[in-house]
């Protein structure tokens, strides 16, 4: 059996500032793949903790890291890249991720163009609409992580 190589990564499930009164989650459409909506995520640099990577990635991708951390998924969770995407990520077969559930403090600080843009648009959507909006190869991971946060009473 071949050993798969996964890129260490963090991902943020960003709840709107109205959480817990409203259960709306932030999703963004990738700039390089039209119609590909996802949570903000990104690689963990060498020597960086997952929490440090989370703050850096949010600042880079959505222009703000003014968040309140609500919870963290307790373990790494991995997914494989679709075969047509593998070439983009060098020698990696997929990504292993640490998920953080966070509440955004202010929506007026979101700026997708603050750094090199990775997203073309964003929306806050109701949690029940999430899975039908997300790219198919990430749905199982999203389903598992959301189910965990629901069981723990956060969602």
Curated annotation (Swiss-Prot):
Superkingdom in the source lineage: Bacteria
PROSITE patterns associated with the record: NUDIX (PS51462), NUDIX_BOX (PS00893)
GO biological process, alphabetically ordered: mRNA catabolic process
Any one Gene Ontology cellular component term annotated for this protein: cytoplasm
The keyword Hydrolase belongs to this UniProt entry's keyword annotation: yes
GO molecular function, one term: mRNA 5'-diphosphatase activity
Family: Belongs to the Nudix hydrolase family. RppH subfamily.
Function according to Swiss-Prot or TrEMBL: Accelerates the degradation of transcripts by removing pyrophosphate from the 5'-end of triphosphorylated RNA, leading to a more labile monophosphorylated state that can stimulate subsequent ribonuclease cleavage.
PANTHER family: M7GPPPN-MRNA HYDROLASE
Protein name: RNA pyrophosphohydrolase
Source species: Helicobacter pylori (strain ATCC 700392 / 26695) (Campylobacter pylori)
């Amino acid at each position: 059996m071949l050993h798969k190589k996964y890129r260490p990564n963090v991902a943020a499930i960003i709840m709107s500032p109205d959480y817990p009164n409203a259960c709306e989650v932030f999703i963004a459409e990738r700039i390089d793949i039209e119609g590909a909506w996802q949570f903000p995520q990104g690689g963990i640099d060498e020597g960086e903790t997952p929490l440090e990577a989370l703050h850096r990635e949010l600042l880079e991708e959505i222009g703000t890291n003014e968040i309140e951390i609500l919870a963290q998924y307790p373990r790494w969770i991995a997914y494989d890249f679709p075969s047509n995407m593998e070439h983009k990520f060098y020698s990696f077969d997929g990504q292993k991720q640490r998920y953080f559930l966070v509440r955004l403090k202010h929506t007026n600080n979101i700026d997708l163009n603050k750094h090199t843009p990775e997203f073309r648009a964003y929306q806050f959507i109701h949690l029940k609409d999430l899975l039908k909006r997300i790219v198919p190869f990430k749905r199982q991971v999203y389903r598992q992580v959301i189910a965990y946060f629901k069981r723990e009473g956060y969602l």
